[in-house]
Amino acid sequence: STLMLSSAASDVYKRQRKIRFKVGMVFQYPEYQLFEETVYKDISFGPFNKGLSQEEIDKEVRRAAKFTGIKDELLYKSPFDLSGGEKRRAAIAGVIAMDPDVLVLDEPTAGLDPMGRDVLLSQIVRYHKERQNTVLLVSHSMEDIARVADRIVVMNKSKLVMFDETQKVFARGDELEKIGLRIPQITKIMSQLRKRGVDVPEGILTVDSAVDYLLPFIKKEAR
């Protein structure tokens, strides 16, 4: 069989070295991905193996570090002295420094506090908008997915069971629950309000969008 990646229709098996730099992956546990003496060296590993000049490597390292919120003083520390959130950002910086066409993130917010989660998700959204590349987010957090995903692939026992726009997938809440998943909590609350006769539209997936809709409604009812 022939496996193709992107519209260039390159044969993956014949051009493995070139293809490796088209896809970057951040593991769920970044400490397994970090290995160099300093954060700077860790981030520079990918660009170095791409054959970039030292000047280009330095540029990519600092671009990736700035993008992920890694301060200059952290670049020369051991990655193993970082906090959990800092390790996560360092691991992501090391991958995006290669400027991959496809960025794969495996449970990127696992173990982060609410603030760290919000910051990381915002960075992922901004990265996608600025670079206009493909970002694949592997997650069991429906709230995270609702915030960042345009389309959702649902797998069950290694089989594809759904592939559609985010709102359309979450509209199939009963089917999701049967395979052990759930719709975002706020979406479920809005669904319950509709069942009680409140004129609430479908497709509200985040707390922010729920507040935007309900606040004028509540003010009107309070008069």
Residue ranges and their predicted role:
Residues 145-147:
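A short, surface-exposed alpha-helical micro-motif characterized by mixed small hydrophobic
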Residues 103-106:
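Catalytic Walker B motif of ABC-type/P-loop ATPase nucleotide-binding domains
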